[in-house]
Amino acid sequence: MDAVVNLTTLPYRRSVGILVFNHEGKVWVGRRLMVCIHEDTKIYHRWQLPQGGIDENEEPLDAARRELYEETGIRSIELIKEAKYWFHYDFPQEIVGSVLGSKYRGQIQKWFAFQFTGELSEIKINPPPDGHKAEFDQWKWVDLETLPSIVISFKKHVYMKIVNEFRGSFKGL
């Protein structure tokens, strides 16, 4: 039987989240590969924005650019806006033992919005560039407002904040 982890004693993992707007003002989302959380529980194909951890001594903006490239191959971007605040979410108790080795209670994220200035052929998710592990099996452009309705439930409140933070940020080319 697995030991129960006391979430309140664990720190949040510092990470970044990335919105990429296309020339029509739609946002890039990727469909996560199936994640096996526990032998009895599987999370199938949820959509999410690119995100990832901030390395030691790395600035959040640099981490955002790195994570975006590692997960999507996208490099042709221009910064539109950095979120004013950090947003956080907690992992559900039942997945803490499987996510990030039980070291974190959740993630605290700095979010960035970018304008995609490249060609669609630049986007490579499976496999992503430079031997990085694939995280997505499909991608599409969606309206910013739809994001909270397509993500896993424990991230929904953060995505609602992201929509509020970045609504009106897209200026077009």
Curated annotation (Swiss-Prot):
Its cofactor is a divalent metal cation. Accelerates the degradation of transcripts by removing pyrophosphate from the 5'-end of triphosphorylated RNA, leading to a more labile monophosphorylated state that can stimulate subsequent ribonuclease cleavage. The keyword Cell inner membrane does not apply. GO terms for molecular function: bis(5'-adenosyl)-pentaphosphatase activity; guanosine-3',5'-bis(diphosphate) 3'-diphosphatase activity. It comes from Bartonella henselae (strain ATCC 49882 / DSM 28221 / CCUG 30454 / Houston 1) (Rochalimaea henselae). Belongs to the Nudix hydrolase family. RppH subfamily. SUPFAM superfamilies: Nudix. A motif (Nudix box) lies at residues 52-73. This is RNA pyrophosphohydrolase. It is an enzyme of class 3 (hydrolase). It comes from the Bacteria. InterPro entries: Nudix_hydrolase, NUDIX_hydrolase-like_dom_sf, NUDIX_hydrolase_CS, NUDIX_hydrolase_dom, RppH. GO terms for biological process: nucleoside phosphate metabolic process; ribose phosphate metabolic process.
